[in-house]
């Protein structure tokens, strides 16, 4: 358990990223839910994660960031592309818990949870990117270790892909 801002307690759980039954990555899962399913894509930007997550073109997608450290700048009210996070969640190598920028109004992890999104981290995102590049974007599942052990892969193959996600 990690304490942030001396107010919010966030529980990181052990979890799994499941891509096409063949590729299963273990990492840390931060979410109010036990699992989430969405299409995966990747982004190679070094900055602008708040803008990327709030961009409506990423609706119903997990964004795999190839830059290794996400969250250090925090979040503010000026860097939104739209009024909320449209991405289903993010995947990154390291999720920074504290903000280190004079413009930050909240830290990144609290913002993710307050927007009902999720994060999956502590894995090699370069390996995930190579899989997506080679086999294409597909629905993946991010889930807690407990959920994976009980229901896991079965649910992934009964979930339809989103169609016409952007109005």
List the predicted regions and their residue ranges.
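RNA-binding accessory domains that recognize and position tRNA/RNA substrates
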Residues: 2-159
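Single conserved hydrophobic/aromatic residue that forms the stacking wall/gate
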Residues: 157-167
């Amino acid at each position: 358990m990690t304490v942030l801002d001396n107010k919010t307690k966030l529980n990181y759980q052990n979890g799994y990223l499941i891509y096409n039954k063949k590729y299963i990555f273990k990492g840390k899962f931060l979410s109010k839910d036990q699992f989430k399913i969405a299409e995966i894509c990747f982004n190679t930007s070094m900055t602008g994660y708040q803008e990327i997550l709030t961009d409506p073109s990423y609706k119903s997608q997990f964004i795999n960031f190839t830059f290794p450290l996400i969250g250090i700048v925090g979040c503010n009210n000026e860097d939104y592309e739209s009024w909320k996070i449209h991405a289903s969640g993010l995947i990154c190598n390291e999720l920074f818990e504290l903000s280190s920028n004079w413009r930050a109004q909240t830290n990144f992890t609290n913002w993710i949870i307050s927007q009902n999104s999720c994060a999956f981290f502590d894995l090699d995102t370069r390996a995930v990117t190579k899989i997506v590049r080679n086999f294409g974007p597909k629905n993946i599942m991010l889930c807690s270790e407990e959920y994976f052990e009980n229901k896991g892969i079965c649910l992934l193959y009964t979930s339809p892909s989103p169609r016409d996600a952007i109005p």
